Amino acid sequence: MASTRLEHMFEVTIEAGLEPGAGTRTVLDRAREARRAELAAAAELLVVAAEWADLHPVPRNGQPAGWGEVDLHGEGLVPLAGEGTPQVAEFAPVELAAHLGISHDAGRQLIGDALELRHRLPRLFDLALAGTVPAWRARQAAALTTRLTPGA
């Protein structure tokens, strides 16, 4: 089988194609290791998003980041995360999203989920960082709790 080189998005070169003598065990071990790395990277991304938010608090008289637009009809911004979480400067999610190559909405959601987990669901945040709960599942829970009151 011919080898295909994938090196556009990654700092490392990934060789596609079986090495001579590679069996099912080798392929399964590589798959398991790739999945472990993927889960660890997703958890690390939550930490990075929360740290990015810490570095970009809302300046005095500044506009916080949120969902929606302020317009003539009085619609306001919905915060990125639930009550009690820190507000983030307006353009912080946009800058992070650009660096990650994701949409602005995905950047807002990532930061919102990270803040929701760290401030309102700290045990779940710790479980995600430990790898006990996949980050994607923790983020689903965070998205469901954002509008709940702290006592709920």
Where on the chain are the PLM-derived regions?
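Peripheral, non-cofactor segments flanking catalytic/redox cores
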Residues: M1-A152
